[in-house]
């Protein structure tokens, strides 16, 4: 992977996260907002809307930890053989981005998924570190939704549940 700055990574990994239907953005095209750069544009990098357990609509930073993957699932845009630009955040980059967006009131939480790098456990452990660092090191009280990584160790899923408000299972269905 070429060296990318945080903004370039955000553009790639927010765009790659849009294929996850469990956190959909508004999808509006009102007032030519799609593709616009003005106030009210609905194409904010990585911002989506979801519903909290209490029913409130909340804005989330929706990103992938990486869009690189060791698997080659034919239905997945991020499959190993896919000709897409690859990027990968570090744990610290995700933490810094989340806090920066949160402190500016752009978001109320984080939605984090990932391609699988190294192994399912390696990837899930990195995602858990993001949530744990936000909660314990930064006293983050915002919402955290983690997509679990298939075949990750049950202990990692249990630990993820200690820090995330919501866990969801990554079940892919071809269309």
Give the predicted meaning of each segment.
Residues 48-51, 100, 157:
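Short, flexible, glycine/charge-rich loop motifs used to bind or transfer phosphoryl groups or to couple energy/partner
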Residues 67-79:
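Local cysteine-cluster metal-coordination motifs and their immediate loop/turn environment
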Residues 40, 49, 53-56, 74, ...:
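General secondary-structure edge motif
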Residues 79-94, 102-128, 133-175:
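Core AdoMet radical
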Residues 59, 72-75, 87:
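Short N-terminal amphipathic alpha-helices
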Residues 1-68:
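Flexible, acidic/Gly-rich N-terminal and inter-domain linker regions that tether
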